[in-house]
Amino acid sequence: MKNQITNQEDLTMKNQATNHSKRRIAGWAASCLLALCVPMPSWAQAPKLDKVVVAGWSKPITEITNLLVEEDKGFFKARGIDLGYVPGAGGGDALRNLLSGQADVAFTDPGSLFSALDKGEKLRVIYDIYPQNVFNVVSLKSQNIFKPADLKGKRIGVYSLASGTRQNLQVLLSQAGLTEADVTVVVTGLLNFAPLMQGQVDATAATDTGLLVGRQRGLGGVNVMEVKNHLNISSDFFVVREATYQQKKELLKRFLHAYQDSAKWMIQAPEEAAKLAVKYAIDGQNVSLNLDIIRLRNESSVSPLTDKRGLGALDMDSLQKGANAYKTFGVIQRDIKISEVVSQDLLPPVMTVKSAKR
């Protein structure tokens, strides 16, 4: 009997020990699970991103795919930036959004910039997005428009009154001693080749990518006057308010580095960019067309100067000639000293991209 009691006591003690061990394991497991659910200390959390909003000249379209793919590629996040985008209807619109405080950086054209400076706005150019002039004026062959003088008395479409298409139309008109008073300017919107094809305008001011899309959509034989043959200056810059330039240089340096990263990616991986444009660009349904647009825009992103000094490098002499020309043409009234409104000190270290292969 005594041995039986002893055995029962031993069994009871073993069961208690086993149960205690099980409780310890369960408690340890619960603690581990709790640790996974509780946030890590603040030092281990992701760093806070700085918000930078870009005021665009357009809606989110294929040719700016490198600005649209942040969710997939994270170029700006990698530089500590939370990127925002405010769409516009022309470079002048982008500057208005910048000056009203809705954005930190404007994606705008030289004509709109010169006009704003002419009105006394305090602005600073910090990056040359497209060092090639991509603007043109296109007409159907039936109109017999071959040179700027032939535009007199014609109806000419522009994207908007605040766009680079209008500014560059003024440049072409000035070549023949004409002004907007000698033509009828018609606002057509971004799809400015439809009115041309339908006979609503005699010619339309556009860009290389716009002409490409027009041809894809059935545009027949046309005559093209390229503005670069008369004034070959950059098509678009990044511009900031002077106060922003003075107060946020380190942030702007990171922004430009991130943009340069994105531009380099689009140059080196146009096929990937074309596929992602389907997801992010409002006009990006056709991958093949996307690729053609992206290749054109890649070509306009590089120049002999960027071959030497990296993407974004600004040609001071060319820009001064452009500003002087706009004054000579009567588009602006004041002298603009480019060295006072253009700075290259925020550009990233040299990253040369010698060509954008087709």
Model-flagged regions — what are they?
Residues G111, L191-N286:
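Pocket-lining segment of extracytoplasmic ligand-binding domains
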Residues L319-R358:
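Conserved C-terminal helix/tail region of periplasmic/extracytoplasmic solute-binding proteins
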Residues Q45-Q198, D202-D208, L219, V224-M225, ...:
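Short, glycine-/small- and polar/acidic-enriched structural segments
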Residues K248-V331:
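Secondary-structure end/capping motifs
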Residues A29-P39:
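Bacterial N-terminal signal peptides
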